[in-house]
A protein has these predicted regions:
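Binuclear metal-dependent hydrolase catalytic cores
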Residues: 1-84, 90-94, 100, 161-190
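Cap/insert and terminal regions of metallo-dependent hydrolase folds
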Residues: 90-183
Length: 190
């Protein structure tokens, strides 16, 4: 390798000061610029997941749509905006209702979109059960959540840029706010 090992890496290989916090679906993690450390708060009401001032509030839901232990989906809220990060998860044909509820009215849903429906259900080499979603599943979930924008994310490595551009163009007719995420991609939500 040109630059050495890049994946997977050990936590000791990360050149940074890290603060690791475990949170559950019944807690939020609050980052406040006036506090040196994030703190956990138990969710007692819907008000507990709404940021106050310049707080950043991180909440999560457990999705069992991947492997044996599932995967965590995160919502990051700041002021009156939020985004939901749902990767490494296999949604459902017809939308993931639990995720749609968690992501309702989100400004940006970043959703695993590894396969086309054709590749996912291929009679020769099906991908169902691999723990990844299709573009259609992402759109169905975004529509059910009434998300404003949808970032397709985590593509099959065999898909080249031209194929991804064609996929994006095709799905824009079904969900106007969809786009392909890419390295360095930035989206302004404020």
């Amino acid at each position: 390798m040109l630059y050495g090992k890049s994946f997977p890496i050990c936590i000791n290989d990360i050149a940074a000061d890290l603060e690791i916090s475990n949170i559950s679906e019944t807690e939020v993690l609050i980052l406040d610029q006036n506090s040196p450390m994030p703190f956990r708060k138990r969710i007692m009401s819907a008000d507990d997941i709404v940021p106050v001032g310049d707080e950043v509030v991180i909440s999560c839901m457990k999705s069992f749509a991947h492997g044996t232990e599932g995967v965590m989906v995160y919502k990051i809220a700041y002021r009156d905006k939020n985004m939901v990060y749902a990767t490494d998860k296999e949604s459902y044909i017809g939308a993931d209702k639990k995720l749609a509820f968690f992501a309702r009215n989100t400004d940006l849903l970043i959703h695993d979109s590894q396969f086309t429906g054709e590749d996912y259900l291929s009679p020769i080499a099906p991908k169902q059960g691999f723990g990844h979603s299709t573009f259609e599943m992402a759109i169905e979930t975004a529509k059910a959540a009434q998300a404003k924008k949808l970032a397709f994310f985590h593509f099959d490595p065999s898909y080249n840029d031209e194929k991804l551009k064609n996929i994006e163009k095709y799905y824009k007719d079904q969900f106007e706010g969809c786009f392909m995420a890419y390295e360095g991609c930035e989206t302004d939500l404020l």
